């Protein structure tokens, strides 16, 4: 016992010392401090970076011809550098920008290691269809968006990966289309084929029918003479401007219940069924610059109607609005009817049928002798709705906006359709 007593004494004093250290430590002071912004964690986290691949691989993989920003290390910018060939693409790159160059070919080795690519922009180059190696894009299983507009393509590129969601082929020379070229594009939501040489015979096999997710289809400025057949019911936006379409088959739009915007200006439309546009969800309808001679039924949800530059002599309100339902008002707010042959303004009863309307733009009308006239119209003041925001009425910058500015805005911000002319 005498031998163990000093050991117990030593342990006792050691325990007291440790207890006193923790007793005097101010825990509250440590946790009450503000976080240190300069504190660096072991892993250098950065916002807007996909960490599927270690960060150090990103910073070491950019080629000398291009620029890879540190804040977007998965993107490689090679645009506007007078490149004639596609440089080597590192494996980790997901967004590749090669627009505004002088590239003429896309070879099989162009993206051989870049299997993570999600977006490729090859617009504004000199690429021809025969210079695209077969299957070069189909080997990219993660590709979502492909830009090939403003090139020299004569044929629709084929094959393409099933993953593709957005395909832009506008401003080319496409006049050939394989029958099964679009069969595998089951995930495509947007297809732009404007400003090509497409004609009716290329579309007769209902090539768009299997695109069950397609929401936007741009076929403007082609050589179409009839409405494209077999459009998918998922379609929300359809652009057919600047073609030679003269008629619309009855019940054509019955299978397009989701259609939100329809643009058919600069065609040859003449006689159309009066209720052809009776679509449940349509908001914008543009049929200006045609040969229409009379108005048609206005669907309840339509907000913007463009009828300029036709041959309409009278806006028949009975046809436009055959009945008034106080519980379900029409949503029309803007009508453009300039450059027609109207001899008198629309009846003031239009405000009973379309209580939300704030602008009827008459502009100049064409007379029978070829001269232009201005219609004398009464001034109507629309009282603000209860749900109108007060700042819209108090803002002097918005108070004097012209009818053209107020009505020309589209619901899809594409460079083709910024203004209704």
From Swiss-Prot:
Transmembrane segments: none annotated. Residues 385-395 have a biased composition (Acidic residues). LRR repeats lie at residues 92-113, 116-129, 142-164, 165-184, 187-210, 213-233, 234-255, 258-280, 281-294, 301-321, 331-353. Glycosylated; contains keratan sulfate. Disulfide bonds join 321-353. It is found in: Secreted, Extracellular space, Extracellular matrix. Residues 396-421 have a biased composition (Basic and acidic residues). Residues 382-421 are annotated as: Disordered. Residues 1-20 form the signal peptide. It holds the Pfam family LRR_8. PROSITE patterns: LRR. It comes from the Eukaryota. Keywords: Cell adhesion, Disulfide bond, Extracellular matrix, Glycoprotein, Leucine-rich repeat, Proteoglycan, Repeat, Secreted, Signal, Sulfation. Residues 53-91 form the LRRNT domain. The modification Sulfotyrosine is found at residues 22, 25, 31, 39, 51, 58, 77, 416-417. Glycans are attached at residues 113, 121, 187, 242, 316. PANTHER family: AGAP008170-PA (PTHR45712), OSTEOMODULIN (PTHR45712:SF3). Belongs to the small leucine-rich proteoglycan (SLRP) family. SLRP class II subfamily. Binds the alpha(V)beta(3)-integrin. This is Osteomodulin. It comes from Homo sapiens.
